[in-house]
C-alpha cells in the first residue's frame, strides 16, 4: 500500500494532493484527520476499499475498533443503516487484516 502512489497518474495526484497537502496542514492531529477522513468516506458510500484502509489507519494510531463502532453509531441517523452496516463490515475487515 505504501507504494500505491507509483501505480499511475491518479494515484500520484492523490498522494501529492491529499497526503502532501491536507495531511501536512496544521490544526488537527493525525488521529483527528484520520477520523474525519473515515467519517467522510463512510458517509459518501461506495468506497469501501478506501474506508477499510482508513479504518486500519485509525486503528494504527489509536482509534480502536470499539471507538470506530461508536463513531458509526453516532453517524447512523445522518447516513442511514446501509452505510453504517457497510462501515462496520469495513472495520471488521480491517481488524482481520
Task: Cite the ranges covered by each PLM segment.
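Acidic, glycine/proline-rich low-complexity segments that act as flexible tails and inter-domain linkers
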Residues: 1-30, 60, 76-77, 82-97
Amino acid at each position: 500500500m505504501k507504494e500505491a502512489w507509483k501505480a499511475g497518474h491518479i494515484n500520484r495526484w492523490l498522494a501529492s494532493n491529499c497526503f502532501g497537502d491536507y495531511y501536512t496542514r496544521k490544526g488537527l492531529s493525525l488521529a483527528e484527520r484520520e477520523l474525519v477522513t473515515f467519517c467522510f468516506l463512510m458517509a459518501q458510500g461506495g468506497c469501501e476499499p478506501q474506508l477499510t484502509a482508513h479504518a486500519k489507519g485509525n486503528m494504527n494510531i489509536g482509534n480502536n475498533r470499539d471507538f470506530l463502532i461508536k463513531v458509526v453509531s453516532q453517524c447512523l441517523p445522518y447516513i442511514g443503516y446501509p452505510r453504517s452496516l457497510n462501515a462496520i463490515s469495513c472495520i471488521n475487515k480491517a481488524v482481520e487484516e
